[in-house]
């Protein structure tokens, strides 16, 4: 073999003849043959090969440490016969890389260092030929056990030093060291020895032993070693290294006495040592094939299972949806030429097809049945309020149950509350069942319809059902005649026909109706019945016998009285067929359609109105009644004369009324609100029109104002002529049919003025409520009416909080709140000022009649009243200051001004006499001259009889005298009762609470009405503050008259314009007159319509101040203190200011959404309160003046609580008809409730 000779590399430190020292080499350098020492460290040798080592015969020391050696070739060291020391520490040599012949030629080897390698086991065959080995270092490896074969078969009789430290040795065999008899030093430290037999007794030469840093377990198995160690350390020649570290592990409780191995004995050892031996074998790592396969199989199975589950769920949903769709098609679709019940079994490929689709997401698409020449659309418009009762649920359940049955001809289908109601009867085809015209003819606006079917007494209790159905106009002129001659199926179809045949019709949708913008262009397919006509008397008789046929209904639709589900808000969204597709289709299918001329369309509209009027549930005909009889008319009969029906005059029984007619006579007069799209002639308009809320009709045909004023009293009806507006008109529920409702007290209808009509054009959601006084009313009750609002559904939660939290709610307050409410059904009228049953909504301008009745009432009651009236009168003046100017700083800007503004302007428009205006603007609470004006208005009240007023006064005064002895006690407790009764009246809206709520309401009426009579608007003033604060925004002009707002509470926004100048004025009579004049001038500048209003108001205010001056002087004579006088003066002053504010915003009121019709009742109440102040006499005694202030402070003590409850509900805007204008209007003032001490201070101190 050639010897490779190379020069000494640069990395070699020493290159001599005997020694070669290199580092960081990747190979073994070719040293000279004479080299005795070869040291190569910190290199990168992966293996030891025979190259350049086989010829180093003289080599005695070979050091290859820290080179990363992993493999040693079998013959790499065979030429080193003279090698004595072999250093291979800090490498990666494993047990498998050493064979039995690796060290076989090293006969002279004495020191073998294999420290810090990867040795796991020891085999004695490695050292078979190394008999001269004296030092063996195996520390820092991974040796786990020493068995008998570890050194067995070796010839290491010369071995003196054995280092096995820092390994993983946990087991040592009993004869492991027997082949090594000459051992002198043994190091077994830093291992995992817990149990070890006595292996050191054969080693007689042992002088150094190290056993520390192990995990000794002091059991009885370790007792032999402990005994050896105790004997071993007795000799001074023996050394036990780190004997103090031979501690037992705290594994058992038995070692408490033997904490060290040296102290372990038979007495303190633990005999219950675990009897097992952990033997770690050197085996190659198994591939995780089975585990991976198992995991793969499990994962695949799980994925397949989840996929299958998802498919099953999807399939189930799909089938369920198809089943629902199929059910919808079966139930709502049929061809027009077949019986109604026969469509369930027919094939869908027969003549004609239906494309209706009724889903469960409250959505009804256009349901049209297209035959050879007929189509019928059924539409359901969006509705904000849909309260389902038990009848709808029962009908829906019966409808589904009847799916599988075919009961013959005569079944009826219509949609109600988001459900498709189905009614059948098994009568013969000749006996047609009348359809529920009250539901089908309801024009677009949701109505409270009571008892669509009159049930038998034992079956179902009266339920309230609210449904939203679109009434569409008929097209052919003879539909009205044929309507009741056709079967119920054709009846249902024709009642929902659209007014055009094959033309795109755009209903007049106004700008604020954003919800209908996507549906401006709508195409409707109309159809006409193909059934022959029957005589006219026949269909009228069918309508009369409609309720009777319902009792005999054999279909069992109403057998289940309990509702299965209750959906409070169930809106329906209509999806319409595109215009282009229908035009193409209709051109293809029906090219010979006849277009109706304009006279025919008008005639159709007239017939539709007549039909609607006949079938309406609450129609009341007053055309044949006298003027005095109209006020007490009964809504149980409807008489209508149709010119097209040969003047058939038949009494139609309202389907809503299910009780005997005798009970109807005792109930209060019902308010009928009829919504008809168009009346084409003046005669029908005079009969049917009462209130216009849409400019569409006004654009179509403008009726002269004189015609309206002359004919408007003919009928107490309300019209909503917009076809797709979200305006809802709610009729009054009768007390007999709804025992839980309160009775009504009604006022006669008033004329429609120019101002109100102008406001009606602007405000699309204005609604008029006409009430009338009833002679038979034992209690004064109010039934809440809902004002048609666009956003009322969003305001329902706020209303509920407001009504439940307000401690001083009264009837008038709830009246206003309930107009924007959805769910309120009634409220008590306990806090009616002066017990006047007729002081209720008064939207129309002509208020002379109402004022007269109120004045006459108050005048007669004045005679029997005690001093409490005078006390409360002072309280009312201050309360009017506080609530009108402080509690509600923006009260007069929008709402309260409606009354003053519209009345003032309307009286000017109608040329009402100055006496009425003086009565209207009388501001002094103690001006007796105004009382005469109230009596002068007797001439304006021709429809009210004195007997009615006296009868009601008599009842109320009798209960009033019973309450006079509880003056202050009743004053503090009655508002709480009002809150409880009102809350109960709202919370007990459910049908199961009818009786309880009725009893509570009656008790409340009998006790609270007389109390409020004697206390004169005490609760009324507090209740008016709630709606005003909640919805009225403060205009900038209100700051012109905050003079007396300092009297009790401070107005936060009152210091905008004129508070500085007015506060600087001293409080005397001249200053007050000057202030009123200034206010009048400012209002005169603001009013563009009428300058005479402001001047007249200034004159009236001066007259009032004169009366106050007289009263002040008279009070000084009686010796009353100054604070009482100033209190009264500020009361009159602030009352005048509040009244003036009503005029300041009159120009703004007409341009804003909230016209007087939106909140007619509150405006009337504000005006009536002023009349109460005008009517009350002026008491001269100083005692009464003092009592007034005392009563005022007592009442003011709980006003902060009321203020807090009002302030909590500031975010509620109850009538946001035009939300854009409401948001862009003046900023809302923030009210800060006064503290208790500030509220109870005297007016002088506060000022």
From Swiss-Prot:
Keywords: Leucine-rich repeat, Membrane, Repeat, Transmembrane, Transmembrane helix
LRR repeats: from-to residues: 34-55, 58-79, 82-102, 108-129, 132-153, 158-179, 182-203
Taxonomic superkingdom: Eukaryota
Region feature (Disordered): 828-866, 887-927, 1223-1247
Main subcellular localisation: membrane
Pfam families xrefs: LRR_8
Domain LRRCT: 214-271
Keyword Transmembrane set for record: yes
Name of the featured protein: Leucine-rich repeat-containing protein 53
Organism: Homo sapiens (Human)
Organism lineage string: Eukaryota, Metazoa, Chordata, Craniata, Vertebrata
């Amino acid at each position: 073999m050639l010897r490779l000779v190379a020069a000494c590399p640069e990395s070699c430190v020493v290159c001599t003849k005997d020694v070669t020292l290199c580092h960081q080499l990747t190979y073994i350098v070719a040293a000279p043959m004479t080299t005795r020492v070869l040291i190569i460290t910190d290199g990168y040798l992966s293996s030891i090969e025979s190259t350049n080592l086989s010829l180093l015969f003289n080599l005695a020391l070979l050091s290859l440490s820290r080179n990363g050696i992993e493999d040693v070739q079998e013959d790499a060291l065979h030429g080193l016969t003279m090698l004595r020391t072999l250093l291979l520490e800090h490498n990666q040599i494993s047990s498998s890389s050493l064979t039995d012949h690796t060290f076989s030629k090293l006969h002279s080897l004495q020191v073998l260092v294999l420290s810090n390698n990867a040795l796991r086991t020891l085999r004695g065959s490695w050292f078979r030929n190394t008999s001269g080995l004296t030092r063996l270092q195996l520390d820092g490896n991974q040796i786990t056990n020493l068995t008998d074969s570890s050194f067995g078969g070796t010839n290491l009789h010369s071995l003196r030093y054995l280092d096995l430290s820092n390994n993983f040795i946990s087991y040592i065999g009993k004869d492991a060291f027997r082949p090594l008899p000459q051992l002198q030093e043994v190091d077994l430290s830093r291992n995992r020895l817990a149990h070890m037999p006595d292996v050191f007794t054969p080693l007689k030469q042992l002088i150094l032993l190290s056993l520390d840093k192990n995990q000794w377990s002091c059991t009885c198995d370790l007792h032999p070693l402990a005994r050896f160690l105790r004997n071993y350390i007795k000799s001074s020649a023996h050394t036990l290294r780190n004997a103090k570290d031979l501690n037992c592990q705290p594994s058992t409780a038995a070692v408490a006495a033997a904490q060290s191995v040296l102290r372990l004995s038979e007495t303190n050892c633990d005999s219950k040592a675990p009897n097992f031996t952990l033997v770690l074998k050197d085996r190659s790592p198994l591939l995780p094939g089975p585990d991976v396969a198992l995991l793969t199989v499990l994962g695949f199975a799980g994925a397949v299972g989840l996929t299958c589950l998802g498919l099953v769920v999807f399939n189930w949903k799909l089938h369920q949806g198809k089943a629902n769709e199929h059910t919808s098609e079966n139930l709502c679709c049929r061809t027009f030429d077949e019986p109604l019940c026969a469509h369930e079994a027919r094939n869908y490929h027969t003549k004609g097809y239906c494309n209706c689709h009724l889903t469960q997401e409250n959505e009804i698409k256009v349901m049209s049945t297209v035959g050879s020449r007929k189509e019928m659309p059924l539409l359901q418009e969006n509705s904000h309020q849909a309260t389902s009762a038990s009848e709808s649920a029962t009908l829906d359940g019966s409808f589904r149950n009847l799916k599988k049955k075919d009961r013959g001809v005569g079944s009826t289908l219509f949609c109600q509350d988001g459900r498709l109601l189905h009614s059948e009867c098994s009568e013969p085809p000749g006996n047609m069942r009348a359809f529920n015209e009250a539901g089908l003819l309801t024009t677009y606006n949701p109505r409270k319809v009571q008892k669509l079917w009159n049930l038998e007494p034992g079956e179902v209790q009266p339920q309230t059902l609210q449904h939203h159905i679109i009434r569409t106009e008929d097209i052919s002129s003879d539909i009205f005649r044929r309507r009741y001659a056709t079967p119920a199926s054709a009846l249902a179809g024709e009642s929902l026909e659209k007014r055009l045949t094959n033309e795109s019709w755009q209903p007049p949708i106004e700008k604020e109706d954003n919800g209908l913008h996507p549906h401006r262009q709508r195409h409707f397919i109309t159809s006409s019945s193909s059934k022959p006509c029957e005589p006219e008397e026949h269909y009228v008789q069918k309508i009369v016998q409609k309720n009777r046929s319902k009792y005999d209904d054999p279909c069992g639709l109403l057998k289940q009285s309990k509702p299965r589900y209750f959906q409070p808000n169930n809106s329906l969204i209509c999806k319409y067929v595109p215009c282009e597709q229908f035009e193409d289709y209709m051109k293809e299918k029906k090219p010979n359609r006849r277009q109706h001329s304009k006279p025919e369309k008008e005639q159709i509209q007239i017939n539709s109105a007549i039909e609607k009027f006949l079938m309406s549930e609450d129609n009341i005909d007053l055309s044949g009644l006298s003027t005095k009889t109209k006020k007490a008319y009964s809504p149980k009969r409807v008489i209508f004369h149709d010119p097209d029906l040969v003047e058939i005059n038949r009494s139609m029984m309202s389907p809503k009324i299910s009780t005997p007619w005798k009970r109807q006579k005792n109930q209060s007069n019902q308010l009928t609100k009829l919504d008809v799209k168009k009346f084409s002639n003046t005669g029908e308009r005079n009969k049917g029109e009462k209130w216009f809320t849409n400019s569409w009709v006004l654009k179509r045909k403008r009726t002269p104002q004189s015609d309206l004023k002359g004919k408007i009293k003919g009928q107490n009806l309300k019209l909503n002529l917009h076809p797709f507006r979200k305006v809802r008109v709610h009729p009054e529920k009768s007390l007999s049919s709804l025992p839980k409702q309160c009775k009504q007290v009604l006022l006669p209808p008033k004329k429609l003025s120019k101002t109100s009509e102008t406001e009606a054009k602007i405000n699309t959601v204005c609604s008029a409520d006409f009430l009338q006084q009833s002679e038979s009313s034992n209690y004064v009750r109010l039934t809440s009416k809902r004002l048609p609002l666009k956003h009322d559904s969003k305001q329902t939660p706020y209303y509920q909080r407001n009504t439940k939290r307000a401690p001083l709610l009264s009837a008038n307050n709830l009246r206003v709140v309930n107009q924007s409410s959805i769910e309120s059904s009634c409220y008590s009228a306990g806090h009616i000022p002066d017990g006047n049953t007729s002081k209720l909504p008064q939207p129309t301008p002509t208020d002379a009649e109402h004022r007269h009745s109120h004045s006459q009432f108050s005048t007669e009651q004045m005679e029997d009243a005690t001093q409490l009236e005078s006390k409360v009168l002072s309280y009312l003046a201050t309360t009017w200051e506080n609530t009108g100017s402080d509690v509600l700083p923006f009260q007069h800007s929008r709402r309260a001004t409606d009354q003053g503004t519209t009345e003032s302007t309307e009286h000017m428009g109608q040329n009402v006499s100055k006496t009425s205006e003086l009565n209207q603007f009388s501001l002094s609470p103690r001006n007796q001259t105004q009382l005469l004006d109230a009596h002068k208005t007797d001439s304006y009240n021709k429809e009210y009889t004195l007997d009615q007023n006296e009868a009601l006064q008599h009842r109320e005064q009798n209960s009033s005298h019973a309450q006079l002895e509880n003056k202050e006690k009743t004053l503090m407790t009655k508002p709480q009762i009002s809150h409880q009764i009102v809350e109960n009246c709202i919370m007990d809206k459910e049908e199961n609470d009818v009786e309880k709520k009725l009893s509570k309401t009656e008790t409340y009426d009998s006790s609270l009405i007389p109390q409020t009579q004697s206390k004169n608007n005490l609760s009324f003033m507090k209740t008016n503050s709630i709606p005003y604060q909640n919805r009225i925004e403060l205009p900038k002009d209100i700051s012109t008259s905050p003079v007396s707002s300092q009297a009790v509470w401070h107005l936060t926004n009152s210091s905008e314009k004129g508070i500085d100048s007015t506060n600087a004025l001293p409080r005397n009579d001249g200053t007050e007159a000057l202030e009123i004049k200034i206010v009048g001038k400012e209002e005169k500048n603001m009013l563009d319509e009428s300058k005479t209003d402001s001047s007249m108001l200034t004159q009236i205010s001066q007259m009032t101040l004169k009366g106050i001056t007289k009263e002040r002087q008279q009070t000084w004579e009686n010796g009353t203190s100054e604070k009482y006088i100033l209190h009264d003066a500020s009361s009159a002053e602030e009352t005048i200011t509040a009244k003036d504010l009503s005029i300041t915003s009159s120009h703004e009121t007409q341009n804003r959404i909230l016209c007087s019709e939106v909140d007619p009742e509150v405006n009337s109440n504000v005006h009536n309160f002023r009349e109460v102040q005008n009517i009350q006499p002026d008491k001269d005694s100083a005692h009464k003046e003092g009592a007034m202030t005392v009563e005022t402070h007592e009442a003011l003590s709980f006003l902060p609580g009321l203020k807090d409850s009002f302030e909590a509900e500031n975010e509620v805007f109850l009538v946001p008809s035009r939300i854009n204008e409401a948001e862009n209007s003046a900023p809302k003032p923030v009210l800060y409730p006064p503290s208790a001490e500030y509220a109870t201070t005297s007016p002088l101190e506060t000022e």
